[in-house]
Amino acid sequence: GMSTEDFAEYRTEIGKEPFEYEGHTITGFAEDAFRYFRTLGDKQFIVDSMTAKPGPAWNDFVEAINNGSIFSIITARGHNPETIKDAIYNLIISDHMGINKDLLIKNLRKFRDLSNMEDKSDMELIKDYMDMNKYYPVSFGTDAGAANPEELKVQAMKEFISYVKGQAKEMGKKLYVKDDVNNNFVPSIGFSDDDLKNVEVMKKSFKDEPVLKTYSTAGGTKTRY
């Protein structure tokens, strides 16, 4: 098989002309090439999420969770969105590699207090938080996104930006009612991808959207793009 990082480099060449890859001649996609990136691989994905080596943007993901910030998973994979949610829930509950569920719960309670919302149990707070986040496996239910996911990722990002702006507006209204002077929420969103084509298309599509910052994690290093 070909690693996801190598696939990002070669995907525009596959099926056009034969080329050599690690001693093999690649002429096109294998039959059902993305089977483990779709629902067939859901169970394995949950296992892999607990054992995989963290990527260059992992610390940003940990920071978002620990702060109780809304996040989105936009991926070329086609797993069921609930599978991705379950995998992240497991990471939180197990305090995986820097994730701190107690700090998350503390910050979630802080937000609820600011919004004059009633308190809930720790597990209910985490469940509600997981439901607030967005999960976009753009190949879910279709084969269209696995090989060329960039435009589908753009559509997902448009939806997520709109959602986050709406959440920020609602939070601002609640703080205004509470007479809190710090009621002007301006969301900031970071998007990272190890496929430069995805980063290029995302940056171009949102060049006039100041809330979005794009980063490349190609080659195992996170850089502003």
Could you tell me what each predicted segment is?
Residues 145, 149, 187-188:
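Extracellular C-type lectin-like domains
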Residues 1-147:
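Alpha-helical substrate-recognition element adjacent to the catalytic core
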Residues 172-175, 180-225:
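Acidic, Mg2+-coordinating phosphoryl-transfer loop and its flanking beta/alpha structural elements
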Residues 77-79, 152, 194:
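Short beta->alpha linker loops
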Residues 118-136, 155-163, 184-188, 196-200:
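Conserved GTP-binding G-domain of TRAFAC-class P-loop NTPases and closely related GTPase folds
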Residues 74, 160, 215-217:
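Conserved beta-strand termini and adjacent loop/short-helix elements that scaffold enzyme active sites
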Residues 54-66, 150-185:
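Short, basic/hydrophobic alpha-helical segments
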